[in-house]
């Protein structure tokens, strides 16, 4: 590609709507990295005569980052939605053989090609909203062959689509039916066979565990973290979603990239996360969809300076959501985040939750030129509108990969 000077734009380079430039320009090198950003009046002489692209006064933000998804799976769980409307809880449905395990059955039965095609349909609307990086977890196979198939599909999505895909091995997502009553033995399988094999195949960027009374204990979760550490892999945790089990403090002890959900997080967990630099990933779509009533401790997170990220948590059972903009709206309306917190939560802080701050979440010299173009008057509109397509253009590595006539 050729070097380009993008101009006539309003720039929010670091995901903070309180830190912007009204008349800005972005110089992008031929290799797709950013050469310079700043005021249009300050363009260095070396870039002034580069070919230009006029963005007609639109806002530019870093490409959005969806840092927690379960995008690859078989089937759907609309029947459970009806059960919840009739009064059944998430835990009750799981105890009846529904929940995660029902998706495990559908995923095990699906071919790799079928999983790929279904995942493509879920990914496309996210890309059209300006998402340029996404995390995709396994965890609906719960045995080696199916977990491998899920992670292979995630890698294929990154090859087919203009999006950076970060894979997370979530073998410790639920107890498979064949291991009923033998959770410790299943953790043996996860740590001694599944993780080593998948890591050796280059399919794993990070390791996650569902630490909850319907998931795995602290001791079992720690075994998974130890196995990840032996492989030099970063960890993250589904923690404190349904109860306060101390998972966030354990995650912090292992310097986890993130602890996610966190409705029942307490002050000790918040302090531990602050000390370890662990990002709090909040998932308002799941909170809304399962009609949770316990809010995450937003004020505690703010007071301790814990970075807050937002993600869709796309999954078939508790958050069949394919809109990061709607997630921003929910973060503001349900969790009472500010627009500033919401936008940082899907850019800079979301990148930190993936351990990818050097590549995503901010527009600075040397980083990938991944950005989204928004023909709006104020960045608050990104969280204000819902159900309305706002993104006019997506640029990935300096190349336009999506356009919509939004004016």
From Swiss-Prot:
<dbReference type="GO" id="GO:0005737">
    <property type="term" value="C:cytoplasm"/>
</dbReference>
<feature type="binding site">
    <location>
        <position position="313"/>
    </location>
    <ligand>
        <name>Zn(2+)</name>
    </ligand>
</feature>
<comment type="pathway">
    <text>Amino-acid degradation; L-histidine degradation into L-glutamate; N-formimidoyl-L-glutamate from L-histidine: step 3/3.</text>
</comment>
<dbReference type="InterPro" id="IPR006680">
    <property type="entry name" value="Amidohydro-rel"/>
</dbReference>
<feature type="binding site">
    <location>
        <position position="238"/>
    </location>
    <ligand>
        <name>Fe(3+)</name>
    </ligand>
</feature>
<protein>
    <recommendedName>
        <fullName>Imidazolonepropionase</fullName>
        <ecNumber>3.5.2.7</ecNumber>
    </recommendedName>
</protein>
<comment type="similarity">
    <text>Belongs to the metallo-dependent hydrolases superfamily. HutI family.</text>
</comment>
<feature type="binding site">
    <location>
        <position position="77"/>
    </location>
    <ligand>
        <name>4-imidazolone-5-propanoate</name>
    </ligand>
</feature>
<feature type="binding site">
    <location>
        <position position="68"/>
    </location>
    <ligand>
        <name>Fe(3+)</name>
    </ligand>
</feature>
<feature type="binding site">
    <location>
        <position position="238"/>
    </location>
    <ligand>
        <name>Zn(2+)</name>
    </ligand>
</feature>
<feature type="binding site">
    <location>
        <position position="70"/>
    </location>
    <ligand>
        <name>Fe(3+)</name>
    </ligand>
</feature>
<keyword id="KW-0862">Zinc</keyword>
<comment type="function">
    <text>Catalyzes the hydrolytic cleavage of the carbon-nitrogen bond in imidazolone-5-propanoate to yield N-formimidoyl-L-glutamate. It is the third step in the universal histidine degradation pathway.</text>
</comment>
<feature type="binding site">
    <location>
        <position position="317"/>
    </location>
    <ligand>
        <name>N-formimidoyl-L-glutamate</name>
    </ligand>
</feature>
<feature type="binding site">
    <location>
        <position position="241"/>
    </location>
    <ligand>
        <name>4-imidazolone-5-propanoate</name>
    </ligand>
</feature>
<dbReference type="InterPro" id="IPR005920">
    <property type="entry name" value="HutI"/>
</dbReference>
<dbReference type="Pfam" id="PF01979">
    <property type="entry name" value="Amidohydro_1"/>
</dbReference>
<feature type="binding site">
    <location>
        <position position="313"/>
    </location>
    <ligand>
        <name>Fe(3+)</name>
    </ligand>
</feature>
<keyword id="KW-0369">Histidine metabolism</keyword>
<keyword id="KW-0378">Hydrolase</keyword>
<feature type="binding site">
    <location>
        <position position="68"/>
    </location>
    <ligand>
        <name>Zn(2+)</name>
    </ligand>
</feature>
<dbReference type="GO" id="GO:0019557">
    <property type="term" value="P:L-histidine catabolic process to glutamate and formate"/>
</dbReference>
<dbReference type="GO" id="GO:0005506">
    <property type="term" value="F:iron ion binding"/>
</dbReference>
<keyword id="KW-0479">Metal-binding</keyword>
<keyword id="KW-0408">Iron</keyword>
<feature type="binding site">
    <location>
        <position position="140"/>
    </location>
    <ligand>
        <name>4-imidazolone-5-propanoate</name>
    </ligand>
</feature>
<feature type="binding site">
    <location>
        <position position="173"/>
    </location>
    <ligand>
        <name>4-imidazolone-5-propanoate</name>
    </ligand>
</feature>
<dbReference type="GO" id="GO:0008270">
    <property type="term" value="F:zinc ion binding"/>
</dbReference>
<keyword id="KW-0963">Cytoplasm</keyword>
<feature type="binding site">
    <location>
        <position position="318"/>
    </location>
    <ligand>
        <name>4-imidazolone-5-propanoate</name>
    </ligand>
</feature>
<dbReference type="GO" id="GO:0050480">
    <property type="term" value="F:imidazolonepropionase activity"/>
</dbReference>
<feature type="binding site">
    <location>
        <position position="315"/>
    </location>
    <ligand>
        <name>N-formimidoyl-L-glutamate</name>
    </ligand>
</feature>
<dbReference type="InterPro" id="IPR032466">
    <property type="entry name" value="Metal_Hydrolase"/>
</dbReference>
<feature type="binding site">
    <location>
        <position position="140"/>
    </location>
    <ligand>
        <name>N-formimidoyl-L-glutamate</name>
    </ligand>
</feature>
<dbReference type="InterPro" id="IPR011059">
    <property type="entry name" value="Metal-dep_hydrolase_composite"/>
</dbReference>
<feature type="binding site">
    <location>
        <position position="70"/>
    </location>
    <ligand>
        <name>Zn(2+)</name>
    </ligand>
</feature>
<dbReference type="GO" id="GO:0019556">
    <property type="term" value="P:L-histidine catabolic process to glutamate and formamide"/>
</dbReference>
